[in-house]
Amino acid sequence: LFHREVILQEIWLAWQDLDEFSLWSILAKSLAYWTTLLAAGSALNLLWLRETAPHTISLLRWFGPTCAVFAILLNSALIPLQASYLIGEWSAIQDPMMLQFAWESPLGDSLLLRGVGLLLILVAIRPKKLRLGISTLGCGLVALSFAFQGHTLSEPRWLLVALITVHLLGLMFWIGGFTPLAWLAKRQDNSTGLAARQFGKISI
């Protein structure tokens, strides 16, 4: 109990030390990452659900691309937020030099690759075989984009890149599977049990 109180106190103190730029960055990144994972996860789950539970196609063909659009917008906002965070002023949003500095950082490389991946996911709105292949490639690029920033920049870089990419693909699949499975369960569809078992097998 004592340790829990100490941890909570440390969290509260750390929260109080955050400035407004950090708070907005945390909020924007949380929303950007969540919509990104939902978009990619929906596209990945569409690959197997179209055979196991065809009823989910009508849901995922709109849900995934819609999340992708929001993800593109939210990820785009990270560049001006990063520029403002660096100098501690909102005026950096209109400063071409600071925006360029933020764009040329590892964050910019990551967002560029992620944006391309999200654009490819948009083709899942018409889930034909070729388009599903393209959207799957987009999911791979999205997962890879997270390896272009943060601790994966250290050595052994390519091993870390491979590990984080595989980890993100698994996370995308898990997150993207919850919405269609919940939708099937709510409708009490006959394919719910089969879909849940198939989801579990693929996840393992």
Predicted segments, located by residue:
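Polytopic transmembrane helical bundles with strong interfacial aromatic enrichment
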Residues: L1-I204
